[in-house]
Swiss-Prot record:
It comes from Homo sapiens (Human). This is Heparin cofactor 2. Changing K204N: Reduced heparin- and no dermatan sulfate-activated inhibition. Residues 1-19 form the signal peptide. SUPFAM superfamilies: Serpins. Phosphorylated by FAM20C in the extracellular medium.
Length: 499
């Protein structure tokens, strides 16, 4: 068996366009997660038959995952109707399984993840753990950037890419990834769960999130580029296609035309919002995994363009910048967290997606908030929210971020994936290692909605008669799809005047 070391390159490209949003409370009514220890047979992923029914040639006709991005030379009828393939999906998503330990048992601590799992469906449980991983990754990232830097990541894309990679991992490398991603916690939570359940749920999640006719546009595509003559295992290519809808494509990374061709492809996927994503690539690269996400949503309560005005935004105790502040009035859910000393506002998009805006009361409160952010905290916010008429002021912002996540993932404990001694024998019989995990994304938050003609109909009462939520200092934002509890995007806006 050959063991020459090759490079594995991962690109995660995300882009989001948002129509309308809202901000903090100037006057608002103040109103140890450990899974049950089990010893799952991690090698079952490799020993069990993961095969699912092979997808017909007409791949993704009614699903936005690949529908709009047909490879050159292929026709529409080469894609399939996922509505027919996944006709059972919604029932599967809503299944609530029994837990290994009752969340009311005395030996289960108050912070145990099983308490969060209680009453949740399979896919919600997986997404709770995806969010837990995302919050931990965010904490590592924010320690690597300046306090005044903006941050933007797409947790669903990162977890999907890692799940896809894990299909080809073996031994300690596989267990390390599954432990840090909390997939191991998921498997231990119920006797009905095994490793194959995780990949099945990612498959189902793709169908749920990227299906049409939800009132928003959410698109994703996974591409697997393989260097010519690289001996990638057929079993890995098959599993990646079946579970993650990633198509293996032949590539010549030493060809300068590859960069321009891929950039054009990405630009098409993201509707022109991400350009020149690839600037250079190591000719020695053997495999590149590309995950792209595009989102555009319309606010339920829109912001009249004529109400946008210049407003002070406090960067810190001493510095202030002028920003374009949007303004609207309507019924909004909001909460006050006295423990973390912050206000939370929920801004709804059409179709079951919403953005949580989290604003510390004190300028120094961001560090505490970032350190304490967990799925349990978010659930506490959501359960304590009250609905009433509020005036909302939120700055327009656009974030463009580009990260190499290798060092961040290493700091989290995922080291063997990037080491020459890592075991990726399920991908190739040659020794390979990942030397780049690129995560790039863009988000734009403004007044726009799908029905711009209606945005001028919002009326305003005198400010003194309303509860006002003004976002005029650094804040966090979290974007969730509610039925699946999926954390799509999250970030920090420290300075709206900068990208």
């Amino acid at each position: 068996m050959k063991h020459s070391l090759n490079a594995l390159l991962i690109f995660l490209i995300i882009t989001s366009a948002w129509g309308g949003s809202k901000g903090p409370l100037d006057q608002l009514e103040k109103g140890g997660e450990t899974a049950q220890s089990a010893d799952p047979q991690w090698e079952q992923l490799n020993n069990k038959n993961l095969s699912m029914p092979l997808l017909p040639a007409d791949f993704h006709k009614e699903n936005t995952v690949t529908n709009d991005w047909i490879p050159e030379g292929e026709e529409d009828d080469d894609y399939l109707d996922l509505e027919k393939i996944f006709s059972e999906d919604d029932d599967y998503i809503d299944i609530v399984d029994s837990l290994s330990v009752s969340p009311t048992d005395s030996d289960v601590s108050a912070g145990n993840i099983l308490q969060l799992f209680h009453g949740k469906s399979r896919i919600q449980r997986l997404n709770i753990l995806n969010a837990k991983f995302a919050f931990n990754l965010y904490r590592v990232l924010k320690d690597q950037v300046n306090t005044f830097d903006n941050i933007f990541i797409a947790p669903v894309g990162i977890s999907t890419a890692m799940g896809m990679i894990s299909l080809g991992l073996k031994g300690e490398t596989h267990e390390q990834v599954h432990s840090i991603l909390h997939f191991k916690d998921f498997v231990n939570a119920s006797s009905k769960y095994e490793i194959t359940t995780i990949h099945n749920l990612f498959r189902k999640l793709t169908h749920r999130l990227f299906r049409r006719n939800f009132g928003y546009t959410l698109r994703s595509v996974n591409d697997l580029y393989i260097q010519k003559q690289f001996p990638i295992l057929l079993d890995f290519k098959t599993k990646v296609r079946e579970y993650y809808f990633a198509e293996a494509q032949i590539a010549d990374f030493s060809d300068p035309a590859f960069i321009s061709k891929t950039n054009n492809h990405i630009m098409k996927l993201t509707k022109g919002l991400i350009k020149d994503a690839l600037e250079n690539i190591d000719p020695a690269t053997q495999m590149m995994i590309l995950n792209c996400i595009y989102f555009k949503g319309s606010w339920v309560n829109k912001f009249p363009v004529e109400m946008t005005h210049n407003h002070n935004f406090r960067l810190n105790e001493r510095e202030v910048v002028k920003v374009s502040m949007m303004q609207t009035k309507g019924n909004f859910l909001a909460a006050n967290d006295q423990e973390l000393d912050c206000d939370i506002l929920q801004l709804e998009y059409v179709g079951g997606i919403s953005m949580l805006i989290v604003v510390p009361h004190k300028m120094s409160g961001m560090k505490t908030l970032e350190a304490q952010l967990t799925p349990r905290v978010v659930e506490r916010w959501q359960k304590s929210m009250t609905n009433r008429t509020r005036e909302v002021l939120l700055p327009k912002f656009k974030l463009e971020k580009n990260y190499n996540l290798v060092e961040s993932l290493k700091l989290m404990g995922i080291r063997m994936l990037f080491d020459k001694n890592g075991n990726m024998a399920g991908i190739s019989d040659q020794r390979i290692a990942i030397d780049l995990f690129k995560h790039q994304g863009t988000i734009t938050v403004n007044e726009e909605g799908t029905q711009a003609t209606t945005v001028t109909t919002v009326g305003f009462m005198p400010l003194s008669t309303q509860v006002r939520f003004t976002v005029d200092r650094p804040f966090l934002f979290l974007i969730y799809e509610h039925r699946t509890s999926c954390l799509l995007f999250m970030g920090r806006v420290a300075n709206p005047s900068r990208s």
